[in-house]
Amino acid sequence: MKDYLVKQVSEDGQLRAYAVNATQVVTEAQEKHDTWPTSSAAFGRTIVGTLLLSAAGLKGDTKMTVKVDGDGPVGKIVVDGNAQGTVKGYVTNPHVNLPSNEKNKIDVKAGVGTTGTLSVTKDLGLKEPFTGQVPLVSGELGEDFTYYLAKSEQTPSAVGVSVFVNEDSTIGVAGGFMIQILPGADDRLIDVLEARLQEMPLVSELLQQGMTPEGIITEIVGELPMKTLEELPVKYECDCSKERFAKALSSIAPQDLKQLIEEDHGAEATCRFCGKQYQFSEADLKAILAEQ
């Protein structure tokens, strides 16, 4: 099944719903960063959460950066997303593989940690980007995204993010959902949704059964009539370039650039988001120095 995200709204205007299959996106992230199972699950869940938040909160050329910074061995997770369904990211410690938890699942909570922060920075094209930050409440990440939306954006929501890692450390499936209650919604509807969410299987189990993002939303909302607003392809794509790294080098102090020229006779830059390497010759560095 292809990767895509669907946005829906109930016909009575009481709720918005988003669901995504991001299996190929998370697979590409896993392969680019050589992540081990615990890191893969934590990184993948953050990617899925970023896709959902970006779909709900961005338009046009706007962007966002999600940072999960817990006290677990995985370290910091950073994911950039945009309104077009494109993400890129990195994890500080990709090689974490902890023992399974008591449910015999990957122990994401132990990997991420339970003390730390989840922050979302939106670049909406204004003078200053907007950042909302909340403490981690779970470390499982779905609950942490839900808490962020309630506290930082005052939007009552339910977020589920799920990654299944195969025995050989490849990604089996990855996806998630986000349900947002709109102003004026009936309390009875909220009660019904909460009950259905309690009984619902994991998103990864539904995806393994071949369920589509639309099917995942139906699993949650039941017979409530919904209409689709948009179907958005999603992908992992890095926009790094040699020009961008040259710009970064041009911000280095002149004496440090001279040191690179005289001692190293060049420089190598590696993109944290995709691992691509860029070589700068002595002549390249001299040209950058001359433009300072």
Curated annotation (Swiss-Prot):
Database matches in CDD domains: Hsp33
Disulphide connectivity of cysteines: C238-C240, C271-C274
Keyword Disulfide bond listed: yes
Disulfide bond among keywords: yes
Assigned keywords, A-Z: Chaperone, Cytoplasm, Disulfide bond, Redox-active center, Zinc
Top-level taxon of origin: Bacteria
PTM statement from Swiss-Prot or TrEMBL: Under oxidizing conditions two disulfide bonds are formed involving the reactive cysteines. Under reducing conditions zinc is bound to the reactive cysteines and the protein is inactive.
GO BP term, pick one: protein refolding
Gene Ontology MF terms: protein folding chaperone; unfolded protein binding
Pfam families: HSP33
GO CC terms of this entry: cytoplasm
Places the protein is found: Cytoplasm
Free-text function comment from the UniProt entry: Redox regulated molecular chaperone. Protects both thermally unfolding and oxidatively damaged proteins from irreversible aggregation. Plays an important role in the bacterial defense system toward oxidative stress.
PANTHER family in the cross-refs: 33 KDA CHAPERONIN
Family membership noted in the UniProt record: Belongs to the HSP33 family.
Record's protein name: 33 kDa chaperonin
